[in-house]
From Swiss-Prot:
Name recorded for this polypeptide: UPF0398 protein OEOE_1093
Organism: Oenococcus oeni (strain ATCC BAA-331 / PSU-1)
PANTHER family recorded: UPF0398 PROTEIN SPR0331, UPF0398 PROTEIN YPSA
NCBIfam families: PRK13660.1
Cystine crosslinks: none
Amino acid sequence: MQTRLWVTGYRSFELGAFNDKDPKIEVIKRALKENLIDQLENNGLEWIITGGQMGTEQWTCETAIGLKKDFPQLKIALMLPFSNFAANWNQEHQVKLTDLRTRVDFSEALSKESYKSPIQLRNFQAFMLKHTDGALMVYDPDNPGKAEFEYKAIQAYQLEHPDYSLKTIDFDMLTDISNEIEEEKRPW
C-alpha cells in the first residue's frame, strides 16, 4: 500500500512549456491525473507530497487540488528545501507558488535558512524519500534533466528499501496521451 507518494519530474523550462496554455501541460496533467486516480483507487493513496518547482511539481498540486472534490480524503503537501525558495523568480511565478501554498493541506520549508549549499537539496531528497512510500516521476531516463538527481536518489534508496516503488511517466506514455487527447478533439 502506498499511502504517501512523492511526485516530481521535469521543470517547465526543460519541456519548453513557458505559459499555462501550452498544450504540453494538458498532456502532462492528464498523465498525472490518470496515475493519481489509479493510486487513490487501488493503492490507498492518502498524501501527495511534492516540491514547489515550476513544472511537474506545481502541475501536480494543481491536478491534485482538482481531484479533491471526488477524493475528499486526499491530502497535498508542498514542501520546499529552504526558505525564500522562489526569491530569484519573477513576480508572476512567485505569486503562483504563494497561491498554491495556500491551497494545499500543508506547506513548509525544511530549512529555515535561505539557500546556502547543495546539502539543503540533498536533505530535501532524503526527507522526501523517508516520508513517502513511493514516487511518481514525469521523467524519461533517455532524456535526462534536472530531475535526474531525484531519479538517481530514488534508485539508490531502492537498493536499501526494495519496497519503495518508482513509476515513471516517460515520453512514450506522454505521446500516447497526446494522441488520445487529439482523438477526443476530433469532430466525428
